[in-house]
Amino acid sequence: MTDNLLLAGRCRYPRKLEADLWAREAVFSTGLGFSFAIPHSKSEHIEQSTISVARLQAPVRWGDDEAQFIIMLTLNKHAAGDQHMRIFSRLARCIMHEEFRNALVNAASADAIASLLQHELEL
């Protein structure tokens, strides 16, 4: 996922950003159950705050659980405030609702996922 941020011009050092994400993950898993994970990090290696989504063909091990739908939040380390934690909290609450999870999992396109996230997260 970090390589895609490089390709999009949102990150210059994807391996360093990835290391920041895994360091955060080592503190406490961001797996939420329901096959969802929300890795997140404030990093000096991200140029522009970004929400990235991966819908995997098969689940992967994520902490003590599995994840098949990954929503990665990356925010520039110098960004003001706690925006990423507000988005993380709002997203985690949404994921607790089966209707929201089903809408994400069954979305027909990347645009449909983006629209749903923008609406629910008030972006």
PLM region descriptions:
Residues M1-L123:
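Cytosolic covalent-transfer regions centered on His/Cys nucleophiles
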